[in-house]
Amino acid sequence: MEALEEKEAQVAAWLKKIFGDHPIPQYEVNAWTTEILYNLSERNRIRDRDVYLVTEDLKQKAKEYESEAKHLQDLLMESVNFSPASLSSTGSRYLNALVDSAVVLETKDTSLASFIPAVNDLTSDLFRTKSKNEEIKLELAKLEKNLTATLVLEKCLQEDLKKAELHLCTERARVDSRLQNMDFLKAKSEEFRSGIRTAEEQLSARGMDASLSHQSLVALSEKLAELKRQTMPLKKKLESYLDLMPNPSLAQVKIEEAKRELDTIEAELTKRVNMMEL
């Protein structure tokens, strides 16, 4: 319990330090929120400590560099009676450029022995960067080519899709039309069947022979077709008899009798078919 109260006090102090004169946002104070804010305050404290140490180290190095620079200036004055302040504007620019180059190249001093390796390393980095750029350019060219092909393919697919949709609409309209025609034909067929049944009932009521009904006439028509099929061999056989020379008169009589019998059958069936159509 004491540990929790200590953490709450530390969190409150940290929030007051963070927000300063601004009001601290309201939040629910419980063990969970206190633990989270306590961990944040600890991380913030550690970060501030690290920043402080780095800052102090940089300040110390700056003092050391200033001391070293003053020592070198004094050494120059004592040895050759030279001071950077005595340089011309051009000399000052050259000196500043030399110093800036040393800083950029991260050399330990401005001697030629330090500059040459640094420049060589920079040149190597430049070549590696150029090589990498060339690889990236080639990769980009491949990607652009693939992208172009993909776009062309996408356009073709879109056109094919439009054609397919148009064809589908046309086929759908055709199917709908056929369905409507089929429904119409079914209705008409049912109407005709009903009319035939009604007519047959009326004719039957009037004493019509059942053999003249629609079904009977259809059966007779089928029977006529079967008789015609069966008489075909007889006709062929009869034709072969016509070529025979003995007793032509008797043969002619038989032929005429067969023709009359066949004509009678065909006439009777034709009459019944015509009555069916009426």
Swiss-Prot record:
It is found in: Cytoplasm; Cytoplasm, Cytoskeleton, Microtubule organizing center, Centrosome; Cytoplasm, Cytoskeleton, Spindle; Cytoplasm, Cytoskeleton, Spindle pole. Residues 53-81, 124-152, 183-277 form a coiled coil. Keywords: Cell cycle, Cell division, Coiled coil, Cytoplasm, Cytoskeleton, Microtubule, Mitosis. One of its GO terms (biological process) is spindle assembly. One of its GO terms (cellular component) is mitotic spindle microtubule. Component of the HAUS augmin-like complex. The complex interacts with the gamma-tubulin ring complex and this interaction is required for spindle assembly. Associates with microtubules. The interaction with microtubules is strong during mitosis, while it is weak or absent during interphase. It is unclear whether this interaction is direct or indirect. Interacts with EML3 (phosphorylated form). Belongs to the HAUS1 family. Contributes to mitotic spindle assembly, maintenance of centrosome integrity and completion of cytokinesis as part of the HAUS augmin-like complex. This is HAUS augmin-like complex subunit 1. It comes from Bos taurus. The gene is HAUS1.
